[in-house]
From Swiss-Prot:
Pfam families: DXP_synthase_N, Transket_pyr, Transketolase_C. GO terms for cellular component: cytosol. One of its GO terms (molecular function) is thiamine pyrophosphate binding. This is 1-deoxy-D-xylulose-5-phosphate synthase. It comes from Aeromonas salmonicida (strain A449). HAMAP family: DXP_synth. Homodimer. The keyword Lyase does not apply.
Length: 621
């Protein structure tokens, strides 16, 4: 059920940016209040990302009010903060469907709206893409403006600084808005800074500034002295020296919840030449006290009653795989003081909270820097430490060269705990863990393990930690079967699977937690069922022995079929001249859409019913 728009009279008049720009300026504060309340009421009914969007209401309104979107291009980074943008760009009445199957995409998505100029989901891409658009805009000569909005977390990533460096070098007209909601850069926010921002973005100041640069450019000693004096004086007021050094005109910080200051400053900056950076201070969760107090807890929320000012407590059911990993990490750290835990800004999601509290000196959150996380781990391993990198499958894609060049090439003992492998559900195609088996199994020296349940996950983490070479354990989002997890840890024999059920005719080789869904098919078909455990090294002897006693194979995995574990089985059989029919079940050759995990597994035929139906249809063909 959607939110009744009749309770929001000003928002009702701004279904699109064109309608928004027709509103008198004086009504914008009321509009912002209604937009924030509508967002809260909508997300609380649908679930989704809340705190970030609450903090960008005024900024979103100001950007669409000043810029002629969609002709002017507005590029959002990651997209957690873009819910107000979706509401104002013709999607207000569909917000209750966000992150649901066949509903609105959780992030800006090009196929969904002409206002979404860049499909996003991973961080730190906005500036690079916006620069490309700015270069194209200059060549077309139509006066098109380009704006990138990036958070203070995302801007710490290497590729964001690569783009800033390039933008400052090519001097194209573009605006980068730094949405600073963590007080990690500066706390100098208030009336004085808002006033300074208006002055510094105004025509008079800009003319004097640029004119002065041209005059001083002909006087090298004076130019250098003036530059140093400007840096010294400016550093006393604003923290923009770094951005100025990169070639940007820095303005701010200003209050990101002062709609009047935002609109006036953006109007001034819209006409400025060369790269501009506006530093905006916002409060994550703004306007909803529980979210302001706990922005991490309210970052992504389930359905809840906002009037109760509390989120529903998670049921005390089966532990998640992330929790299994977190407990293993603490247990292992107690046994081995060489253990070091590393995460690229995913402490809560990866289950590292307890470890970070118990072992703060051995815990490193390297921020959104996946490439650095892996090479940092390599350095630790060289220095006789035992690094464990906790990372989401989709984010490990960013560090593939570092996995190969910095870890595997030197066969360093780095353990990769790969969370969110397989289908993650509501976050959609940008976050599905569809490719890690494919890109890791091709890497020499790498051990790749796929636990079928929580206990295997714990034992495989221990096995990878002890194997003295690069190793990866991949496990899905959510909980497992509820099987008892053994406290005692044991090293599994590398490359050895186990037969779960003996049958005849068909051998089903399961990689990972889809073993549970394959059980019903194995029973119905009287097939042999194998928990393969290892993608690399694979249990070749077991597969070949099954080839001698079975007529056909079925492989099952929650990874892309192309290049996945099933492909490894195919290669093994062909290499040994075992020409057996093989049905490979897994993720198709497309970017898999959003929905609940259960919905998408069923859609792809990877639930119990679908697996059995696929095998039966294949056998009868």
């Amino acid at each position: 059920m959607s939110v009744d728009i009749s309770n929001f009279p000003n928002l009702a008049l701004a279904d699109t940016p064109v309608e928004l720009r027709s509103l008198p300026f004086e009504r914008l504060p009321l509009l912002c209040n209604e937009l924030r309340e509508y967002l809260l009421r909508s997300v609380s009914r649908s679930s989704g990302h809340l705190a970030s969007g609450l903090g960008t209401v005024e900024l979103t309104v100001a950007l669409h009010y000043v810029y002629n979107t969609p002709f002017d291009r507005l590029v959002w980074d990651v997209g957690h903060q873009a819910y107000p943008h979706k509401i104002l760009t013709g999607r207000r009445d569909r917000m209750q469907s966000i992150r649901q199957k066949d509903g609105l995409h959780p992030f800006p998505w090009r196929g969904e709206s002409e206002y979404d100029v860049l499909s996003v989901g991973h961080s730190s891409t906005s500036i690079g893409a916006a620069l490309g658009m700015a270069v194209a805009a200059e060549s077309e000569g139509l006066g098109r403006k380009v704006v990138a909005v990036i958070g203070d977390g995302a801007i710490t990533a290497g590729m964001a600084f690569e783009a800033l460096n390039h933008a400052g070098d090519v001097h194209k007209d573009m605006l980068v808005v730094l949405n600073d909601n963590e007080m990690s850069i500066s706390e100098n926010v208030g009336a004085l800074n808002n006033h300074l921002a208006r002055i510094m973005s105004g025509k008079l100041y800009t003319t004097i500034r640029e004119g002065g640069k041209k005059v001083l450019a002909g006087l090298p000693p004076v130019k250098e002295l003036a530059k140093r004096a400007e840096e010294h004086l400016k550093g006393m007021v604003v923290p923009g020296t770094l951005f100025e050094e990169l070639g940007f005109n820095y303005i701010g910080p200003i209050d990101g919840h002062d709609i009047e200051a935002l609109v006036e400053t953006l109007r001034n900056m819209r006409n400025l030449k060369d790269p501009q950076l506006l530093h905006v201070k916002t409060k994550k969760g703004k306007g909803y006290e529980p979210a302001e107090k706990d922005p991490i807890g309210y970052h992504g929320v389930p359905k809840f009653d906002p009037d109760e000012c509390t989120l529903p407590k998670a049921s005390g059911g089966k532990p998640s795989f992330s929790a299994i990993f977190g407990q293993w990490l603490c247990d292992m750290a107690a046994k081995d003081e060489k253990l070091v835990g590393i995460t690229p800004a995913m402490r809560e999601g990866s289950g590292l909270v307890k470890f970070s509290q118990q072992y703060p000196d051995r815990y490193f959150d390297v921020a959104i820097a996946e490439q650095h996380a892996v090479t940092f781990a390599a350095g630790l391993a060289i220095a006789d430490k035992k690094p464990v990198v906790a990372i989401y499958s989709s984010f490990l894609q960013r560090a593939y060269d570092q996995v190969i060049h910095d870890v595997a090439l030197q066969s360093l003992p780095v353990l990769f705990a790969i969370d969110r492998a397989g289908l993650v559900g509501a976050d959609g195609p940008t976050h599905q863990g569809a490719f890690d088996i494919s890109f890791l199994r091709t890497v020499p020296n790498m051990v790749v393990m796929t636990p079928s349940d929580e206990n295997e996950c714990r034992q495989m983490l221990y096995t990878g930690y002890q194997c003295n070479q690069p190793a990866a354990v991949r496990y899905p989002r959510g909980s497992g079967t509820g099987i008892e997890v053994q406290t005692e840890m044991q090293v599994l024999e590398l490359g050895k699977g186990r037969i779960v059920r003996n049958g005849k005719g068909t051998a089903i080789l399961a990689f990972g937690t889809l073993l549970q869904q394959a059980r019903a098919a194995a029973e119905a078909l009287d097939a042999t069922l194998v928990d393969m455990r290892f993608v690399k090294p694979m249990d070749e002897a077991l597969v070949l022995s099954l080839a001698a006693s079975h007529d056909q194979f079925v492989t099952i995995e929650d990874n892309a079929i192309m290049g996945g574990a099933g492909s490894a089985v195919n290669e093994l059989l062909m290499r040994n001249k075992q020409c057996k029919p093989v049905l490979n079940l897994g993720l198709p050759d497309r970017f898999v859409e959003q929905g609940t995990q259960e919905e998408i597994y069923a859609l792809l035929g990877l639930d119990s019913t679908g697996i059995q139906a696929s095998i039966e249809a294949w056998l009868q063909a």
